[in-house]
Amino acid sequence: MSGVSFELGGVSISSRLVLGTGGAANLHVLEQAIRAAGTGLVTVALRRVDSTPGGSGGLLDLIDRCGVRLLPNTAGCYTAGEAVKVAHLAREAFDTDWVKLEVIGDERTLLPDGVELLRAAEELVAEGFTVLPYTSDDPILARRLADVGCAAVMPAGSPIGSGLGVSNPHHIRLIRQCVDVPVILDAGIGTASDAALAMELGCDAVLLASAVTRAADPVAMATAMRYAVEAGRLAYRAGRIPRRFHALASTPDDGRPEL
């Protein structure tokens, strides 16, 4: 299907659905969900993986079997310094310069700290990382992150794990308009219609985890998300009709019989 893949950091990614691995009941279910989602990119927190020689490697083996690209993240970091250190550890452990940059500002909301995030992004870009920052839906911060060289911006639709969907569609549209890098909606997706809406707003991809891993049937939900992302992208490219206050008949009056 045209438009399914997209370019990220100079690499063609085979699907516009990015899948997180947190919250899965077990590795068997996670593997089934990854395959059902058709994703080409999965995120992994460094602290969830034993990457030392002789370590369990269960999650890494699973990712390798599925043939998808691994994107380490800096989950659990609250300062720029912590995030930079974790990014370096991930680069050494996984042999990748890619990092999903997370710098959390508050334990209750899990929303990003924009000041620390921008500081960490600038430092990591200067050190040769391909930086994909989890950010708020603030268009100005998104533009600043793009300006310092981030390969994409990843605004939250709503707080992580909340399932509230896209709380501020207008800001997501503004972000799409003010940056030239890919926009990946990250966090807050609850069901397939949320993912479709994100794509209809112009996002290049959607990243989600809890919506699949904590669903009653993770594999079925992964399948639903796959098609929702594809449908949303097609709808965005097709162009929706303008919203109108009054009705507009689809059938013309020409040829109507005189009764």
Curated annotation (Swiss-Prot):
Its EC number is 2.8.1.10. One of its GO terms (cellular component) is cytoplasm. Coiled coil: none annotated. It catalyses: [ThiS sulfur-carrier protein]-C-terminal-Gly-aminoethanethioate + 2-iminoacetate + 1-deoxy-D-xylulose 5-phosphate = [ThiS sulfur-carrier protein]-C-terminal Gly-Gly + 2-[(2R,5Z)-2-carboxy-4-methylthiazol-5(2H)-ylidene]ethyl phosphate + 2 H2O + H(+). Pfam families: ThiG. Keywords: Cytoplasm, Schiff base, Thiamine biosynthesis, Transferase. One of its GO terms (biological process) is thiamine diphosphate biosynthetic process. Its main location: cytoplasm. 1-deoxy-D-xylulose 5-phosphate binds at residues 161, 187-188, 209-210. GO terms for molecular function: thiazole synthase activity. InterPro entries: Aldolase_TIM (IPR013785), Thiazole_synthase_ThiG (IPR033983), ThiG (IPR008867). It is found in: Cytoplasm. The active site is at 100 (schiff-base intermediate with dxp). Pathway: Cofactor biosynthesis; thiamine diphosphate biosynthesis. Belongs to the ThiG family. Catalyzes the rearrangement of 1-deoxy-D-xylulose 5-phosphate (DXP) to produce the thiazole phosphate moiety of thiamine. Sulfur is provided by the thiocarboxylate moiety of the carrier protein ThiS. In vitro, sulfur can be provided by H(2)S. Homotetramer. Forms heterodimers with either ThiH or ThiS. This is Thiazole synthase.
